Amino acid sequence: MKRLSRATAASMLGLALVMSPMTDLQATELKILAGGSMIGSLNELGPQFERASGHKLTIHFDSTPNLIKQVTSGAPFDLVVAPVDVFKDAAAKARFVPLPTIDIARVGYGVIVRSGAPKPDVSTPDALKATLLNAPSITFVPESAAGAYVLKTFDRLGITEAMKAKTKPQTAPAQIAPAVAKGEADLGVFLVNVLIAPGVEPAGPFPAELQQELVFTAAVAADSKEADAATAFITFLTTPAAAAVIKAKGMIPG
């Protein structure tokens, strides 16, 4: 299954589907599975699409492992907007229309501290390593695609065992910043868009040598009875207006 950038997708799908012709589609309900880190963007874009199209969206946000379980279990859904890891699973991949997936957004990793706390140095691999080792506690979501990369980073820095004792795991990305803001953990480590919240401040992004962007891509379920509406929503996510929202939420469109 190939992947397309948003620019290519917009050209191929045709923005006309999102404008006046979209209102010609019979109003329906779309069941969407989405990565938890897309919650900010989709919670704003979803209502915009509903008003423009008349369709009703039901969005279920979850971690990558759980999304794979839902997709492979045969549970009904119309489309996904999820980390590319979902589409690397052979059983999950088989449930999508055999067309190129469409990249919607991407985002890198960073570190946050409680507002007013000293900001540690995370500008180099050695500095990040020292900061993590010196922190009394850290928090992130281990059971997720992003969490898997955080764990990989610990391994690259040679601090996996040291991090186990001080990690306070969360089950959803939206729990990370509040935990730091309330003093339940000293550092939050995750995708930078979900680390933007009241009560916390960025210490900085991962150093370039360790940085990696997680890509969120979209695809229509092969057995969806609402494929046209699902395609219209994906096309909507590639528009300049949607890109502006995605960017405002701390992600990079496409």
Role assignments for model-derived ranges:
Residues 9-21:
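Bacterial N-terminal signal peptides
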Residues 25-75, 81-93, 97-98, 102-107, ...:
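Exported/periplasmic ABC-transporter solute-binding proteins
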Residues 6-9, 34:
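Sequence-pattern detector for short linear motifs
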Residues 1-4:
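N-terminal secretory signal peptides that target proteins for export/translocation
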